């Protein structure tokens, strides 16, 4: 995203303040360090003052007085994931309020996410009422991931695309043709923190709207669209530089009618979102996207819904019945996907095993690419001295499975075991075992109860 160097510096300072940098130095030791490129001869990282102070080539280099975490030879240190498309989780969505948003940010860190865009949507009138309050959370400490701004996914979408590709029987949505005045009103309510906007280019004046977004320093994204290949090209010419959950919410790729997906695959100007959970996009097609775009033009996202973190079972989103299966997808009664509940660490396991993407490239797609796209590439998305100490650590976790009929392959049990945000450890897997694990299970049950069938809600309430 375009922006002045002074703007980047201000954002840098604000983001680092979220890390509460005071405290003793911390050393993380592991078998592999990906910066995201393999760091040959590096065995660990020293974090101090909220940033990466230096890379360590020997365990004896840990300074006196530092907290040392030896995470084992199978552990991999990567830049913290930056998810530009996540709506919520654990029964909550960002517009539910401050406490809800903080809970989502805290829990998202448990899978290795250190920064994200709060993805929201609604009518312009709705958004101007609750965006100011949410904007208070941007770049503030949360005890988890840092909110880096907003991704607006709606109202400027063709909701009929949901019907065309099966996610809903009817959209039930009022259509709002793109209007620059509406955008600036919403951006003012968001205190200038809208970074990414999804829109469908088939609306009247949509191309002019895309030009307006681009000139305002916001990344325009094509999504939830029935656009023809030529219209998709026109949208890119107008300023589109991002594609919302590629292959989903758009015409299926066909060799005689490639649709928007075909244009996204072949235009190097566009960064393509990928939901790599194995359900939204088959691993073979994940590999196709990776080979067509390369690791520098793909951004990994969860598109995590409020049902993220829910166990398998049947739930109700209003009148709509949904099923969470062992692949952690949210499935409708007709067998169509209506969102993902898969965390980013499981997604990475799918991508690097079934999808065949090397870990160093997966780390680039999950951290470096979104950091650069958001104008944060000078201090986030890499593990090098001077950059923010935003680090995710992945290692084999006994019993971790992919589900969804995916094979058990070497690396498919790799999950997040530690997350550091601006030099502060906000999550350690071993700290949630035992009694804390039981307390968390009770918390999760309370969150999911309201979405159960009435008879199940009554039964669980009696327990």
What are these model-predicted stretches?
Residues 184-312, 331:
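Active-site core of metal-dependent hydrolases
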Residues 75-76, 84, 92-146, 170-191, ...:
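Alpha-helical scaffold segments that flank or form the walls of functional sites
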Residues 87, 102-133, 145-159, 190-202, ...:
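Divalent metal-dependent hydrolysis catalytic cores, especially in the metallo-beta-lactamase
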Residues 384-450, 454-460:
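C-terminal cap of metal-dependent C-N hydrolases
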Residues 262-272, 290-396:
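His/Asp/Glu-enriched, well-ordered alpha-helical/loop segment
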Residues 106-117, 159-191, 234-246, 250, ...:
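Active-site gating loops and adjacent loop-to-helix segments of metal-dependent hydrolytic enzymes
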Residues 1-63, 398-401, 424-425, 454-455:
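N-terminal metal-binding scaffold of metallo-dependent hydrolase/deaminase domains
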């Amino acid at each position: 995203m375009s922006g002045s160097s002074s703007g980047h510096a201000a954002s840098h300072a604000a983001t680092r303040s979220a890390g509460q940098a005071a405290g003793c130095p911390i050393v993380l030791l592991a078998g592999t360090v990906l910066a995201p490129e393999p760091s040959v001869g590096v065995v660990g990282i020293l974090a101090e003052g909220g940033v990466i102070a230096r890379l360590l080539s020997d365990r004896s280099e840990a300074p006196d007085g530092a907290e040392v975490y030896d995470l084992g030879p199978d552990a991999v240190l990567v830049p913290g994931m930056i998810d530009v498309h996540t709506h919520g989780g654990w029964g909550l969505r960002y517009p539910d309020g401050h406490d809800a948003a903080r809970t989502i940010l805290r829990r998202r860190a448990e899978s290795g996410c250190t920064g994200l865009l709060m993805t929201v949507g609604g009518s312009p009138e709705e958004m101007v009422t609750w965006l100011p309050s949410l904007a208070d959370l941007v770049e503030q400490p949360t005890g988890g991931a840092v909110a880096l701004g907003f991704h607006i996914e709606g109202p400027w979408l063709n909701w009929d695309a949901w019907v065309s590709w099966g996610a809903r029987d009817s959209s039930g949505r009022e259509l709002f043709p793109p209007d620059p005045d509406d955008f600036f009103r919403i951006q003012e309510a968001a205190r200038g923190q809208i970074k990414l906007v999804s829109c469908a280019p088939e609306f009247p004046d949509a191309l002019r709207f895309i030009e307006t977004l681009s000139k305002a320093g916001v990344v325009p994204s094509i999504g939830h669209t029935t656009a023809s290949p030529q219209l998709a090209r026109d949208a890119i010419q107008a300023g589109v530089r991002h594609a919302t959950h590629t292959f989903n919410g758009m015409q299926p790729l066909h060799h005689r009618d490639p649709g928007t997906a075909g244009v996204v695959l072949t235009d190097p100007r566009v960064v393509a979102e990928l939901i790599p959970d194995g359900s939204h996009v088959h691993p073979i097609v994940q590999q196709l996207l990776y080979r067509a775009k390369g690791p520098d033009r793909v951004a990994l996202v969860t598109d995590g819904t409020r049902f993220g973190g829910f166990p398998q079972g049947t739930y109700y989103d209003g009148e709509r019945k949904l099923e969470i299966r062992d692949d952690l997808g949210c499935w409708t009664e007709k067998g169509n996907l209506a969102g993902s509940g898969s965390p980013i660490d499981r997604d990475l396991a799918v991508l690097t095993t079934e999808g065949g993407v090397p870990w160093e490239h997966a780390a680039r797609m999950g951290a470096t690419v979104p950091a650069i796209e958001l104008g944060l590439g000078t201090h986030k998305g890499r593990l090098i001295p001077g950059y923010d100490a935003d680090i995710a650590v992945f290692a084999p976790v006994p019993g971790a499975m992919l589900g969804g009929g995916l094979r058990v392959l070497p690396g498919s049990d790799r999950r997040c075991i530690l997350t550091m945000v601006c030099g502060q450890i906000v999550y350690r897997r071993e700290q949630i075992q035992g009694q804390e694990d039981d307390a968390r299970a009770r918390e999760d049950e309370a969150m999911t109860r309201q979405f159960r069938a009435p008879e199940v809600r009554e039964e669980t309430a009696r327990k």
